[in-house]
């Protein structure tokens, strides 16, 4: 597989390094483009590098690429994000290997929570915005109930999933790896989210709490993107404060 890293010219001091935010997109069948993004500029102004990842399954690389992810979520996409992180760290010495954190929403939140559980020693903190944490419990409460089936590689059942279906979904979910998590996690949840029901965040929060993990949760009177101006401003500022605190910046 051939992959590429596009990055801006380094303008920092020689020999210095910056913390890295790894930010997988949602969807999963969407794409990150190189257009101007205020959220990236916000974190860059705070001294972070930002790595966006178009993992296999993203749009713009052909139908076979899109379909390659079906049945492989929680594995192929997670591995791609992790490999992209390692490639960036190996090729860009201005990135601090001991200060790698995660951000992502929806399926990006699915990947963020997966990465903290599958690679607990690399990622030091994570912010998950309306994350999918359990495909099995999401199947009955999302406004797109076929999503959990299709992404798990299953045929959509109009009536109800079988126990075997639910076991397959759970096996591909971040909650499977929750006991391995070491990184502090901030969950940002929209109470009116119809796409990823807020119970996904609540379930993960209470499970982390029960395990004695470090977790915080902010809940907003908002929907899937948490896009109302006052709410978006709040979660961005709180995300920065959370990451700074746990990286001791």
Model-based region annotation:
Residues 1-12, 20:
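A short loop-to-beta-strand scaffold at the N-terminal edge of the catalytic core in hydrolase folds
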Residues 15-26:
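Short beta-strand element of the alpha/beta-hydrolase
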Residues 26-30, 50:
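Serine-hydrolase catalytic-loop signature spanning alpha/beta hydrolases and amidase-signature enzymes
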Residues 55-249:
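Active-site-proximal cap/loop segments of hydrolase catalytic domains
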Residues 29-35, 60:
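Glycine/threonine-rich flexible loop motifs
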Residues 6, 23-24, 103, 188:
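Short hydrophobic segments within beta-strands
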Residues 3, 50, 215-217:
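Generic structural signal for residues in well-ordered beta-strands
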Residues 34-53:
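Short amphipathic alpha-helix adjacent to the substrate-entry channel of hydrolases
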